[in-house]
């Protein structure tokens, strides 16, 4: 424990909060180009083939982003919009691709929770 004198001389060090999505550099979203689209397997208690993509952002940083929803139309060189938000059971995946924006189409046949998957209101 520091003495009062030591605190006057040095002061307390502020604890820096870790950024959740550093590659976005403070932006809400960033545009990027898919360099690889593939499936990944989740961590221990879960089992699936999660759809993910390596995306090179406009600032030059390459990140791994999750493709939400059932089915997608993304392939290499697709232009996508990337937002923050990790996938708990995929280590290293800290970003999501925004469905219904740029080249990523909305989820086909989606009726509920449509705004999260870029689906227009059915007629």
UniProtKB/Swiss-Prot annotation:
GO CC term, one of those recorded: small ribosomal subunit
GO biological process, one term: translation
InterPro entries with a match to the protein in the record: NA-bd_OB-fold, Ribosomal_uS12, Ribosomal_uS12_bac
Residue numbers carrying 3-methylthioaspartic acid: 89
PROSITE patterns linked to this entry: RIBOSOMAL_S12
Region of interest: Disordered: 10-32
Domain of life: Bacteria
Molecular function as annotated in GO: rRNA binding; structural constituent of ribosome; tRNA binding
Biased composition (Basic residues): 10-20
Record keyword Cytoplasm present: no
Alphabetized UniProt keyword annotations: Methylation, Ribonucleoprotein, Ribosomal protein, RNA-binding, rRNA-binding, tRNA-binding
PANTHER family, sorted: 30S RIBOSOMAL PROTEIN S12 FAMILY MEMBER
Role description: With S4 and S5 plays an important role in translational accuracy. Interacts with and stabilizes bases of the 16S rRNA that are involved in tRNA selection in the A site and with the mRNA backbone. Located at the interface of the 30S and 50S subunits, it traverses the body of the 30S subunit contacting proteins on the other side and probably holding the rRNA structure together. The combined cluster of proteins S8, S12 and S17 appears to hold together the shoulder and platform of the 30S subunit.
SUBUNIT field: Part of the 30S ribosomal subunit. Contacts proteins S8 and S17. May interact with IF1 in the 30S initiation complex.
Family: Belongs to the universal ribosomal protein uS12 family.
Identification of the protein by name: Small ribosomal subunit protein uS12
Gene assigned in the entry: rpsL
